[in-house]
Amino acid sequence: MNSVLNSGRTTICDAYNVAAHDPFSFQHKSLDTVQKEWTEWKKNNHSLYLDPIVGTVASFLLKKVGSLVGKRILSELRNLIFPSGSTNLMQDILRETEKFLNQRLNTDTLARVNAELTGLQANVEEFNRQVDNFLNPNRNAVPLSITSSVNTMQQLFLNRLPQFQMQGYQLLLLPLFAQAANLHLSFIRDVILNADEWGISAATLRTYRDYLKNYTRDYSNYCINTYQSAFKGLNTRLHDMLEFRTYMFLNVFEYVSIWSLFKYQSLLVSSGANLYASGSGPQQTQSFTSQDWPFLYSLFQVNSNYVLNGFSGARLSNTFPNIVGLPGSTTTHALLAARVNYSGGISSGDIGASPFNQNFNCSTFLPPLLTPFVRSWLDSGSDREGVATVTNWQTESFETTLGLRSGAFTARGNSNYFPDYFIRNISGVPLVVRNEDLRRPLHYNEIRNIASPSGTPGGARAYMVSVHNRKNNIHAVHENGSMIHLAPNDYTGFTISPIHATQVNNQTRTFISEKFGNQGDSLRFEQNNTTARYTLRGNGNSYNLYLRVSSIGNSTIRVTINGRVYTATNVNTTTNNDGVNDNGARFSDINIGNVVASSNSDVPLDINVTLNSGTQFDLMNIMLVPTNISPLY
């Protein structure tokens, strides 16, 4: 493998939502600021039927996993979703989901759900009151035992959670179930973290450690299975498919992906699952099913490890007189083809038509690490501009953190933007995707031209998709255009998404695999002796390196960092796993050993995997955990 070179970075100041010069801007933001941004998002930016509280709660939980401060998450979470003891926000989530799915609870079921919400709020309120009394004996009477209160609350959660899983309404109630599960798992985590202060016995502590693992498993599997059952029934255009996925990820899987990390503390989760957004224009009318999703997903993800610079392509604008003697004219705009560009001179395959005559280029203007794209306009339609002038428009426009806009056409219509997310990739589809492409997902970093079948009427067309991700701790661009990951300056741990590799050998047998119960997607190795290299900018701290892997069959993992080799042999998670069936993967977190991230230098981290015949292997997460904080289970 090539040696790693640091291209360096110049820091400048800008201000727009997320400060691009601060690679840890999310961690530095107050929760009040996060809440205001999601409220503004709902008010001004998006038509998606989504209550802003769902984004706020996800940010809150990520902040808590990344912190040692605040061991009573349940109390703070209660104040977020039951402000002033009200269940209105939870009811808002239900109403928004009813609108999105075009389904409603019947009168009796709605009454039951509302009663359960009221009861859940009251139970959480009472438990927190009892803990307050226990911790402040001079103020109120002390309960006989906090353990009794803990066990009672545990049973109340077990009684109430099934009420959000009612037959016939599982998908509709899934966002409420996820919030109730947030409360339950936060409660269990609180019990473990406060065991000494609350006088919890060693036996009870062991029980609750098991609870955290087991209910994380049960709730994750329920959410994954419910979503996948619904997704398999889709037969719709791309815009609707992506909107359904985005809705469920924001409402449900933002939480599911955090639950399996509840066992860690002071761990900065620096990446996550992607959100995909497209335009709602009428031209791209091909219907897709879940069988087509592996290809579409691979197309949108294939170059996620590179630093996005923009896209170029061919556009066409025609103006002609209106027919039948009508005054004025009609102007049509069309994006014929596009190619996505990355730092380091890397480009994707052609989308829409190949070859094509390029006549425009859309870039971030300034270095992409300093001013990444945060908002996209990918809509299209027709309207009347001036007297008797009709314009059929298409947008394909992007905005950076500086508020600068650029693109193939003018920004108009609905925009795609999510607080604390950056557009880390751009992709797209032609007018019609060929069957031979739909049946053959792209391998890692594959460059493939994607065009409509020959002879398709109007087939030279491209429709963009923006790929949004929380990833921000990027120190610099590697010489090959990929990311160099930045470790925090303090002793906070951090994660690296496996799909954000510097380079991978055996690329034709390496694929990105979608995951739900994990912070982001996995890298699936299908060939023996595959090595993925990651590059991180160190801080001099030592960490315990954990690799989250799924190895259905035996494998050997060799990690090389700072010239030292760490080996884990006979890795097999077929039965020895955390219990979550994550899109075919069954993962376990393997403690590789203590590693040092050398200070002020770019550190290569090589992960080599040898596989026994028939082994299915997914590298799902790379976690560098502070050495003085052990996982809760």
UniProtKB/Swiss-Prot annotation:
<comment type="similarity">
    <text>Belongs to the delta endotoxin family.</text>
</comment>
<dbReference type="GO" id="GO:0005102">
    <property type="term" value="F:signaling receptor binding"/>
</dbReference>
<dbReference type="InterPro" id="IPR015214">
    <property type="entry name" value="Pest_cryst_cen_dom_Cry2A/18"/>
</dbReference>
<comment type="function">
    <text>Promotes colloidosmotic lysis by binding to the midgut epithelial cells of lepidopteran (Manduca sexta) larvae.</text>
</comment>
<dbReference type="Pfam" id="PF03944">
    <property type="entry name" value="Endotoxin_C"/>
</dbReference>
<dbReference type="GO" id="GO:0030435">
    <property type="term" value="P:sporulation resulting in formation of a cellular spore"/>
</dbReference>
<dbReference type="InterPro" id="IPR005639">
    <property type="entry name" value="Pest_crys_dom_I"/>
</dbReference>
<dbReference type="Pfam" id="PF03945">
    <property type="entry name" value="Endotoxin_N"/>
</dbReference>
<keyword id="KW-0800">Toxin</keyword>
<keyword id="KW-0749">Sporulation</keyword>
<dbReference type="GO" id="GO:0001907">
    <property type="term" value="P:symbiont-mediated killing of host cell"/>
</dbReference>
<dbReference type="GO" id="GO:0090729">
    <property type="term" value="F:toxin activity"/>
</dbReference>
<dbReference type="Pfam" id="PF09131">
    <property type="entry name" value="Endotoxin_mid"/>
</dbReference>
<protein>
    <recommendedName>
        <fullName>Pesticidal crystal protein Cry2Ab</fullName>
    </recommendedName>
</protein>
<dbReference type="InterPro" id="IPR008979">
    <property type="entry name" value="Galactose-bd-like_sf"/>
</dbReference>
<keyword id="KW-0843">Virulence</keyword>
<dbReference type="InterPro" id="IPR036399">
    <property type="entry name" value="Pest_cryst_cen_dom_sf"/>
</dbReference>
<dbReference type="InterPro" id="IPR005638">
    <property type="entry name" value="Pest_crys_dom-III"/>
</dbReference>
<keyword id="KW-0614">Plasmid</keyword>
<dbReference type="InterPro" id="IPR038979">
    <property type="entry name" value="Pest_crys"/>
</dbReference>
<dbReference type="InterPro" id="IPR036716">
    <property type="entry name" value="Pest_crys_N_sf"/>
</dbReference>
